[in-house]
């Protein structure tokens, strides 16, 4: 598992600063180098769950399917915002909630239950030298064609500009 972007201590420092000063989200965001929406999320988590809400969640761990359904239904039935739902259910952010809503709208509860979040995709990258060489050659050919087309365009443009200049300033014989 990777290290969280913002450690617990920094989150707590930001939230404490919010409650002990009159500074708004924008000023705190600039002072601590944290996005304003992140400050807002941490404040909401702290208000709802205390310091426990600020503990970073491990990355790559997928949420329980029943929790996903509960969150989506709360957003729809209780008219919660994505940020409110994330804070209420102690989720890392509203991005997951938005993704779950989209899946729910497209495939319903079954789609949320079947959703595999946090699984790594296995993308096979071909390292065939012949294919790589032919792809490089093809890209060079395309680049040459594009440059030739651009040269023709610029030459034509220059010709029209010269013709326009000649018509605008006729020489006397």
Swiss-Prot record:
Q: Does the keyword rRNA-binding apply?
A: no
Superkingdom to which the source organism belongs: Bacteria
Q: Name one Pfam family in it.
A: HTH_28
For this protein, the record's InterPro entries field holds: InsJ-like_HTH, IS150/IS1296_orfA-like, Trp_repressor/repl_initiator, WH-like_DNA-bd_sf
Which GO terms label this protein's molecular function in UniProt? Answer: sequence-specific DNA binding
Keywords annotated in UniProt: Transposable element
Does this entry carry the keyword Secreted?
A: no
| Family membership | Belongs to the IS150/IS1296 orfA family.
Q: What's the protein called, per UniProt? A: Insertion element IS150 protein InsJ
Q: Could you read off the lineage of the organism from its UniProt record?
A: Bacteria, Pseudomonadati, Pseudomonadota, Gammaproteobacteria, Enterobacterales
Question: Gene encoding it?
Answer: insJ
């Amino acid at each position: 598992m990777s290290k969280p972007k913002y450690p617990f201590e920094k989150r707590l420092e930001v939230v404490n600063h919010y409650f002990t000063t009159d500074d708004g989200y924008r000023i705190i965001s600039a002072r601590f180098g944290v996005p304003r929406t992140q400050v807002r999320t941490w404040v909401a988590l702290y208000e709802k769950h205390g310091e426990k809400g600020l503990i970073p969640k491990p990355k790559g761990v997928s949420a329980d399917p029943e929790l996903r359904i509960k969150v989506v239904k709360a957003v729809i039935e209780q008219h919660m915002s994505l940020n409110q739902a994330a804070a209420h259910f102690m989720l890392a952010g509203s991005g997951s909630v938005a993704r779950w809503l989209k899946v729910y709208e497209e495939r319903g509860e079954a789609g949320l239950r079947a959703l595999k979040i946090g699984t790594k995709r296995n993308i096979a990258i071909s390292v065939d030298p012949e294919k790589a060489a032919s792809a490089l050659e093809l890209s060079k050919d395309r680049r040459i064609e594009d440059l030739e087309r651009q040269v023709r365009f610029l030459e034509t443009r220059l010709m029209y500009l010269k013709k326009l200049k000649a018509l605008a300033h006729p020489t006397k014989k």
